[in-house]
A protein has these predicted regions:
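Conserved beta-strand/loop subsegment of P-loop NTPase cores
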Residues: 36-37, 96-97, 122-131, 151-163, ...
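Active-site glycine-rich loop that binds ribose-phosphate moieties when present
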Residues: 138, 142-147, 160, 171-173
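A broadly conserved amphipathic alpha-helix scaffold signal in soluble, globular proteins
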Residues: 107, 111-114, 155, 175-178
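Short histidine/acidic/glycine/proline-rich micro-motifs that form metal-
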Residues: 136, 163-164
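Short glycine-centered, acidic/aromatic-flanked micro-motifs in structured strand/loop junctions
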Residues: 12, 100, 160-161, 251
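Nucleotide-state-sensitive switch-loop elements of NTP-binding domains
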Residues: 2-11, 16, 20-140, 145
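C-terminal accessory "lid"/substrate-recognition subdomains
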Residues: 149, 165-255
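Flexible, charged surface loops at secondary-structure boundaries
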Residues: 30-31, 151-152, 255
């Protein structure tokens, strides 16, 4: 049984560029390694898993598993434990990347990783928090509990989409991070998800502490994607929580 599997959380608010950055890391992974990606989506119908698997094509050395329907440690907590166990004990990868939903609570994800069930099998490394510097102009983002928790538990802040930002926005992000988290938290700009593997292999500085309470999310425990399509050939699913709402459609390829 493999022990000390390196695991990184790649977090960030909605639209920060998490999936693009994970694809960049996968492109740079060693050819002889198997990686597992655990994707969590706020909506009942997963999009990020489809984006990752679609980009990878028929790639047997990357396993992508999904926990849909809300924060993986809230309503989907049981599903996360089952899926993480499957990754550790069946897949036994060389590395695990976890992408929580942009409305998720990564501190609770980290608490799960430190549970007795998993901790001897995992080597918990840096948490990468991705922030689009332009989002600092949006008060509904900067005041959101999920955004603040993502920043507070960061080991490294990635300023995404710098090609779309001006110098003042990049500087404002660095000053904002320093004022909230201190000057020791590094902030680096990365374009088009071009992350280096060197950003991963640093132990996390995270320590268990009081967390921001999660807002209950309306979500069925049963994964929507597993429901059979009716004769009409499509399903519609809705989910809401933390002030956001999603609507997803799943349509048969035959329709």
């Amino acid at each position: 049984m493999r022990k000390n599997i390196p695991v990184n959380i790649v977090t960030g608010f909605l639209g920060a560029g998490k999936t693009t950055s994970i694809l960049g890391l996968l492109a740079a992974r060693p050819a002889d390694e198997t990686w597992a990606i655990l994707v969590n989506e706020f909506g009942e119908i997963g999009i990020d898993k489809a984006l990752i698997t679609g980009e990878l094509g028929d790639c047997g050395d990357v396993v992508v598993l999904e926990v849909p329907g809300g924060c993986m440690c809230c309503t989907a907590g049981i599903s996360m434990n089952i899926t993480l166990s499957e990754i550790i004990f069946l897949v036994q990868p060389d590395r695990i990347l976890i992408e929580p939903t942009g409305l998720g609570h990564p501190n609770e994800v980290m608490e799960t990783l430190h549970h007795e069930t998993f901790k001897e099998h995992l080597l918990i490394q840096r948490t990468l928090t991705l922030i689009d510097p332009r989002s600092l102009d949006q008060s509904h983002v900067t005041k959101h509990p999920s955004f603040l928790q993502q920043l507070d538990m960061a080991d490294l802040v990635i300023a995404t989409k710098p090609d779309l930002c001006d110098t003042h926005q990049l500087l404002a992000l660095k000053k904002y991070v320093e004022s909230r988290c201190g000057p020791e938290l590094p902030v680096i700009p990365i374009s088009f998800g071009a992350l280096s593997l060197d950003t991963l292999d640093v132990p996390t500085s995270w320590r268990s502490k009081d967390t921001i309470a999660a807002t209950p999310i309306n979500s069925s425990v049963e994964a929507f994607i597993e429901k059979p399509l009716p004769e009409t050939g499509f399903l519609v699913a809705r989910n809401e929580g933390d002030g956001y709402e999603t609507i997803g459609w799943r349509v048969s390829a035959d329709k």
